[in-house]
Amino acid sequence: MPTLTSYFGFLLAALTITSVLFIGLNKIRLI
C-alpha cells in the first residue's frame, strides 16, 4: 500500500523535524 507508506513517511518526517526544532529551542534557551 503506497498510500500508507507515504503517510507513515510523512508522519515520521514531521516528528523528526518537530524533535529537532524542540531540541534546538531548548539549547538556545539554555545558552
Swiss-Prot record:
GO terms of biological process kind: photosynthesis
Compartment(s) where it occurs, according to its Swiss-Prot or TrEMBL record: Plastid, Chloroplast thylakoid membrane
One CC-aspect GO term: chloroplast thylakoid membrane
Domain of life: Eukaryota
Keywords on record: Chloroplast, Electron transport, Membrane, Photosynthesis, Plastid, Thylakoid, Transmembrane, Transmembrane helix, Transport
A matching Pfam family: PetL
InterPro entries linked: Cyt_b6/f_cplx_su6
Residue spans crossing the bilayer: 4-24
Subunit record text: The 4 large subunits of the cytochrome b6-f complex are cytochrome b6, subunit IV (17 kDa polypeptide, PetD), cytochrome f and the Rieske protein, while the 4 small subunits are PetG, PetL, PetM and PetN. The complex functions as a dimer.
Function: Component of the cytochrome b6-f complex, which mediates electron transfer between photosystem II (PSII) and photosystem I (PSI), cyclic electron flow around PSI, and state transitions. PetL is important for photoautotrophic growth as well as for electron transfer efficiency and stability of the cytochrome b6-f complex.
Protein known as: Cytochrome b6-f complex subunit 6
Organism: Silene latifolia (White campion)
